[in-house]
Amino acid sequence: VTHKSNPSHSQELTPKFHPELTPSLEELEKQERLLVFRQFTHDDAWALGSLLVELARERQAPVAIDIHRAGQQLFHAALPGSTPDNDAWIARKRRVVERYGSASYLVGARFRAKGTTFEESSRLDPDTYAAHGGSFPITVEGVGVIGAVTVSGLPQLQDHRLVVEALEQFLGNGR
């Protein structure tokens, strides 16, 4: 089931915690167009990661959080209830962002829209790549995708939405 954004909420890129509402490809692509940084520093990684930790703790979400830029891990946190398996999922989802330059959830949704799955049609090892929600590209204006912010521990759409919510807040503060 897909839905269209309510015109009265046109600035909200994704509804928060409505698992029955699956975003359309257009909505997911809009998120990527709008959630762009002017620059992305080590301090930005720390601040964004800390914001994600704060949001996850408010919800008692058992997640691991990771921020990578140009192959370097700039931030990592594992909250209570997360496991080493979440770190493996983070790596697999991040590799999808690095390879496709799009959010892991969007990549999976594009395959589903074609009537197939990422696992069936990508020809990539599912032990190495996972087109499941939770990894979002760090895109710098005039540069392109330079990294990824990733969450693992919730159902994939909730992982995706948590990252988008944090990016909306972070970038809404003029960064």
Model-assigned labels for residue ranges:
Residues 59-124:
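Structured interaction and signal-relay segments at domain junctions
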